Amino acid sequence: GICRDTTVESMVIVFADIPELTCVWRAFPRPCIAPYLPWYVGIAKLPKGYENFGAKTALASHFAVDPTEFRYDSSRAYWAFHMLENIMEFDYQFCEEKVHGDIEKMEAAMTAAKPLIDEAYRKLAETSPEYARQLLTDYTAAQAQKAWEWAEQTALELVDMKNAANMDFWRSKL
């Protein structure tokens, strides 16, 4: 399956006639834990918190990772998804309904918005290619930020829900 403990990332690429509108629908770390987010090929830069290093530094340190990279850092999106992933793996069945319901809603909204963003890009590109590219950059960043905030909030909610369920269980034994 596409959602196993060995899955690091999943993506679906939707090619477009206009290369900048080619969209990589990316689920990190796994599609059962995170929504597929639209990452347009035409973006000018990666969303804040999603790039740890520049390309040269990343290549140089790929097989010799600095130990500080393994410490939690709230300024990096990776850690929000990693925290959610760990909570989900601890009790997948307990978390599944909430997480999958949220993912379905987010993906439906992004899927519905895509044709509108594409059309806005096309119209804007006729008069200002730079602004059109910025539109894609801003939209991609906004969706990435929403998902990051959702992952953080959902991880906390799941912990609270699990604690409440445990307390209810033990109270029922009194």
Segments the model singles out, each with a brief description of its role:
Residues G1-L174:
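C-terminus-biased signal that marks the final domain/tail of proteins
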